[in-house]
From Swiss-Prot:
GO terms for molecular function: acetyl-CoA carboxylase activity; ATP binding; carboxyl- or carbamoyltransferase activity. It is found in: Cytoplasm. One of its GO terms (cellular component) is acetyl-CoA carboxylase complex. Keywords: ATP-binding, Cytoplasm, Fatty acid biosynthesis, Fatty acid metabolism, Lipid biosynthesis, Lipid metabolism, Nucleotide-binding, Transferase. Acetyl-CoA carboxylase is a heterohexamer composed of biotin carboxyl carrier protein (AccB), biotin carboxylase (AccC) and two subunits each of ACCase subunit alpha (AccA) and ACCase subunit beta (AccD). It comes from Xanthomonas oryzae pv. oryzae (strain KACC10331 / KXO85). This is Acetyl-coenzyme A carboxylase carboxyl transferase subunit alpha. Residues 32-293 form the CoA carboxyltransferase C-terminal domain.
Amino acid sequence: MNPNYLDFEQPIADLEAKIQELRKASTGPAVNVETEVRALRDKLRVRTAQIFRDLSAWQVSQLARHPQRPYTLDYINTICDEFQELAGDRAYADDKAIVGGLGRIDGRPVVIIGHQKGRDTKTKVARNFGMPRPEGYRKALRLMKLAERFRLPLLTFIDTPGAYPGIGAEERGQSEAIARNLLEMAELKIPVICTVIGEGGSGGALAIGVGDRTLMLEYGTYSVISPEGCASILWKDAGKAKDAAEQLGLTARRLKDLSLVDKVIREPTGGAHRNPQQMGKRLKAVLLNELDALEKVPLETLLQQRYERLRSYGAYEGR
């Protein structure tokens, strides 16, 4: 699958195009072509490393939204031995912007919940562009309670621009559904690991984001609002999204420095979409290590640590 190149990746695109052209148009001895191809590939590796060594917050935001970035179901297919999806909130409908079910990772039973986006127009509409409605969050809560009932660890994958702001969603209690999940997740009597795999947009992300560990992929984002939305509010100009991205502090490294994220998981050079299998293996290894650690903690201690963790967020200056 050929990746779509972002604007700052143009030098990479140019080098890869040269390599392809050289392979197609070669008329001389193969050894000469291969020598030149190897030289170009070496140059490509160096240039790619240079570009991704110091990305701006806005560039990271673009990577987090990359159309070929792995989504929740992609990771489930990579890390799970088996998975059975469960549907519906048992009250209104099945929201396909949230997926979840029972799975096994190296034989270990878990419950997995995550946001899910689409790849093409049809699936994007079906998944509502990864923006859950109240029934999606209530489906997630149903699965959380199922996990608690059977004492199964809960893994959540966060990747949403935000909760759906439509009138129907508001009428059906969008804010209540999010608030209810925050409350219930804080009290779940099982280990909970939350991983930001792409966009972490505001309350829509937090509704499945309260847990004992918060992990984040290197090029994910996590923020109260999108850079464009922030720029529109502060400066009445969505074109200032680059400035807003820097001010929001939405990157994994920045959030790790603020102790809002526990661990940053390194992505393959160029982003997770460049090597989804490798990214899945890294994620699986980290999740298993974290599960091993959490399952050794007594339940009362786990809940107390989770409470203290939530109380530690934020900072203020007294007068």
